């Protein structure tokens, strides 16, 4: 059977979008073409659309339509990016476009007569641009459990959404010989403060502390603290931990739930309150100990003891095994259904 590809657009801010796309593509029997800035030979590499290296989402224009979030004027990268996506659609005639995430790309694909699945992140996304992207999509994919949904999300959006938690690398459920705290810092925010981390480790001498991701070097070395830098396989580090500390991005939350680890969650500020919404849902479910700020060093011994008392059943209820395969199979079903519709109306 000639299967036209599923196009999968990946936003370039942070690492979670790419990790989710890679997991789904690897599990898919239907051909998937990844596209995004920095994709390289793995798919369709798109020109960068950022005004500055330090991207803050602002486009510097005062005449942006309400249906857009980011539409700078006079930017060659945006023009070339749009042309490349439209050209690929015209040439490959994709069965479906998954957009993770960009309201502009979602509307572009829809305007090009392609059915879309929009990846809907958590948070209050009731602004006009998000609602139009949701309305234009044939379906919505939420990479988290429905129990974490904000109460303010419109009912029609919920009905259109397929909740697919567990889109992550398979969890490895084992513990290190010694109690280990793993602190995870992602690419979507500022580097971790090494001195603050060192003080926390010093306050808990019976624990081995380990950090992955970008962290500044502490002023003085601490014997029970190891900074391991960036890793492409965070699930391996998570598997060796007794407790995980980190923010509330979908990628990390999914990986921690997959590994069934006690979680101390410190959400970071993100547009539309994404991480705060997820953290509140985790706290309400009893699946994590949630803090609004990094605590003083003296509080860490008690927090670690408290994390160990969290009930495993609460976090297990928010996870689904084989998430990438379930997501890939669902997308393939949609692609096949849309192809059948086109054949019937041809």
For every predicted segment, state its role.
Residues 25, 169, 176-243, 293:
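Donor-nucleotide binding loops and adjacent catalytic segments primarily
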Residues 3, 11-12, 27-80:
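Conserved nucleotide-sugar phosphate-binding/catalytic loop shared by glycosyltransferases and other
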Residues 302-346:
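C-terminal amphipathic helix plus adjacent low-complexity
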Residues 114-171:
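Active-site-proximal region of nucleotide-activated glycan assembly enzymes
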């Amino acid at each position: 059977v000639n299967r036209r590809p599923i196009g999968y657009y990946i936003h370039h801010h942070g690492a979670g979008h790419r990790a989710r796309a890679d997991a789904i593509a690897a599990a898919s029997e239907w051909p998937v073409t990844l596209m995004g800035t920095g994709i390289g030979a793995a798919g369709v590499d798109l020109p960068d659309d950022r005004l500055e290296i330090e991207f803050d989402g602002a486009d510097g224009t005062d005449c942006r339509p309400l249906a857009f979030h980011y539409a700078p004027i006079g930017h060659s990268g945006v023009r070339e990016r749009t042309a490349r996506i439209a050209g690929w659609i015209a040439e490959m005639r994709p069965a479906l476009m998954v957009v993770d995430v960009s309201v502009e790309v979602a509307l572009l694909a829809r305007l090009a007569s392609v059915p879309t699945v929009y990846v809907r992140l958590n948070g209050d996304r009731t602004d006009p641009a998000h609602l139009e992207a949701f309305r234009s999509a044939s379906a919505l994919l939420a990479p988290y459990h429905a129990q974490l949904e904000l109460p303010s999300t419109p009912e029609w959006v919920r009905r259109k959404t397929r909740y697919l938690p567990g889109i992550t690398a398979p969890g490895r459920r084992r513990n290190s010989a010694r109690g280990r705290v793993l602190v995870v810092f992602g690419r979507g925010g500022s580097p971790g403060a090494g001195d603050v981390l060192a003080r926390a480790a010093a306050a808990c001498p019976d624990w081995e502390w380990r950090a992955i991701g970008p962290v500044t070097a502490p002023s003085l070395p601490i014997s029970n603290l190891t900074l391991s830098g960036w890793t492409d396989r965070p699930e391996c580090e998570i598997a060796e931990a007794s407790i995980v500390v980190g923010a509330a991005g979908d990628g990390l939350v999914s990986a921690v739930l997959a590994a069934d680890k006690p979680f101390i969650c410190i959400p970071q500020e993100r547009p539309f309150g994404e991480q705060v919404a997820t953290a509140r849902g985790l706290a309400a479910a009893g699946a994590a100990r949630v803090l609004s700020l990094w605590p003083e060093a003296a509080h860490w011994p008690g927090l670690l003891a408290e994390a160990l008392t969290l009930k495993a059943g609460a976090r297990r209820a928010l996870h689904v095994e084989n998430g990438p395969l379930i997501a890939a199979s669902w997308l393939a079903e949609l692609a096949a259904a849309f192809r059948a519709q086109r054949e019937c109306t041809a």
